[in-house]
């Protein structure tokens, strides 16, 4: 005699998933990839994450110290991009106040705390200037602006880019043959963090923790 009740009709929707034999992958995931490409990738990843020698650790520690970042930040960027950090981009508005003097000349006044940090920086430094924050620069003044800035920062600034978005930042780095993977941003606030992230920079360092 057949069953008078349709047990299949009253089954919970998740019963089939619960009864299904689990896969052999981690956490009931897909099966382990045994392909040649996967093996090569796992081997390369294992070598990249291998514990470095004491000499390498010291070299990386000194580099991080020169750049004003932590050892962890340096190595994280290295593992994510395969490149060593060596350059920094800072918004001009964060580094200095720009105004016109009584005779119309451009005056750059470094912010005291930033000037001291720039003096300690041991990498390549670039500034990104928002055209709207600089008082109506002419083309001639813009061409001479780097020299004016470097008089205020003791020649530490390598180049200045103009704009306020990721395209302007990447364009400045490309014009100076600097890979963006080797560059981090020193900024303050969410706006600078979003700018660095959208430009693909591996690290955005808050100025409050720079060299601290």
Please place each PLM-identified region on the residue numbering:
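Flexible, charged surface loops at secondary-structure boundaries
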Residues: 117-122, 149-154, 172-181
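Preference for solvent-exposed, low-hydrophobicity sequence contexts
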Residues: 148-156, 185, 204
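Extended, charged low-complexity segments
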Residues: 169-212
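Structural motif
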Residues: 128-134, 160-164, 186-190
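Long, compositionally biased
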Residues: 89-126
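Eukaryotic charged/polar low-complexity linker/IDR segments
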Residues: 1-37, 41
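Extended low-complexity, polyampholyte segments enriched in Ser/Thr/Pro and acidic residues
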Residues: 139-143, 209
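Amphipathic alpha-helical packing elements
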Residues: 34-91
């Amino acid at each position: 005699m057949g069953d008078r009740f349709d047990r299949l009709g009253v089954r919970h929707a998740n019963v089939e998933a619960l009864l299904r034999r689990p896969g052999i992958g981690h956490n009931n995931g897909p099966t382990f990839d045994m392909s040649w490409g996967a093996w090569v990738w796992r081997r390369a990843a294992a070598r990249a994450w291998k514990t470095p020698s004491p000499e390498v650790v010291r070299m990386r520690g000194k580099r991080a110290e020169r750049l004003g970042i932590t050892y962890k930040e340096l190595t994280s960027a290295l593992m994510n991009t395969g490149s060593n950090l060596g350059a920094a981009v800072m918004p001009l508005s964060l580094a200095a106040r720009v105004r016109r003097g009584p005779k119309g000349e451009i005056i750059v006044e470094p912010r005291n705390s930033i000037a001291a940090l720039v003096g300690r920086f041991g990498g390549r430094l670039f500034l990104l200037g928002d055209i709207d924050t600089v008082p109506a620069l002419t083309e001639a003044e813009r061409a001479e602006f780097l020299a004016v800035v470097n008089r205020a920062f003791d020649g530490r600034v390598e180049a200045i880019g103009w704009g306020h978005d990721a395209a302007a930042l990447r364009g400045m780095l490309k014009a100076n043959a600097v890979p963006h993977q080797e560059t981090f941003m020193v900024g303050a606030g969410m706006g600078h963090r979003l700018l660095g992230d959208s430009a693909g920079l591996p690290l955005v360092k808050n100025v409050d923790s720079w060299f601290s």
